[in-house]
Amino acid sequence: MTAHRSVLLVVHTGRDEATETARRVEKVLGDNKIALRVLSAEAVDRGSLHLAPDDMRAMGVEIEVVDADQHAADGCELVLVLGGDGTFLRAAELARNASIPVLGVNLGRIGFLAEAEAEAIDAVLEHVVAQDYRVEDRLTLDVVVRQGGRIVNRGWALNEVSLEKGPRLGVLGVVVEIDGRPVSAFGCDGVLVSTPTGSTAYAFSAGGPVLWPDLEAILVVPNNAHALFGRPMVTSPEATIAIEIEADGHDALVFCDGRREMLIPAGSRLEVTRCVTSVKWARLDSAPFTDRLVRKFRLPVTGWRGK
């Protein structure tokens, strides 16, 4: 007896291309007896540019509408994403909770995290139906806020942890510590702690290097630091990075992947380590990361002759 198959579809709704691509996903999965699960916030009445469950059921698609909570992807084999990097990061959280792969199809601008572009959706669906994809484990970060030695908040990140000063506030005074030893104290707009996956995102814009995603490391990037030694550092993946906020300064904020926000009171401490739970990444493209880097950033390679 064939096991019941189900895919969670996460879509950046509200645009024609997303709806058209989602309709194609619905038809192909339905034709192949693969059930579809969609998020309640993306499932509204007919006539909108969102997903319409009643229309799908009328076409013979088995569909379930669920809330976007920690159990949204339970029982699914894959999370399929139609959107840009922001949508992918939202979907990655759901996939991580269920320990299943996430596969991105780009409908945004750069879409660095996506595995394919929208025009390749038929080829993508062939791989999904055949379960023909590789799965990579991507390093994630565990984030802890301590105040007076007590944990007051915690979170996680796939791309980066961004410590930032509050809006319209002065320079943020911090001390950066690695593996229990102080490295540098300075004033800044913030500090980024990034994974290799996130090195092409905010950390790159802040002056950090690009790290190949199969490299196991943690990247620390001061953001507009007023310091002689305010340079990016690449640490061991097993390092503990701590950032202490000056006690006589002001509160700060931490953003995990630009989505989950935490308050960092003055005098408290932010600790970032490798998380034991990774994000499972479905890969279709066998091309090296170098090709993706050149393609997504449109890097000039004219004149290259090779061997």
From Swiss-Prot:
pH dependence: Optimum pH is 6.5 in sodium-acetate at 50 degrees Celsius for poly(P)-dependent kinase activity and optimum pH is 8 in Tris-HCl at 50 degrees Celsius for ATP-dependent kinase activity.
Active site: 85 (proton acceptor)
Outcome, altering residue 202 to A: Abolishes catalytic activity
Pfam families: NAD_kinase, NAD_kinase_C
Consequence when changing residue 197 to A: Abolishes catalytic activity
EC number(s) stated in the UniProt entry for this protein: 2.7.1.23
Subunit text: Homotetramer.
Protein family: Belongs to the NAD kinase family.
Protein name listed in UniProt: NAD kinase
Organism for this UniProt entry: Mycobacterium tuberculosis (strain ATCC 25618 / H37Rv)
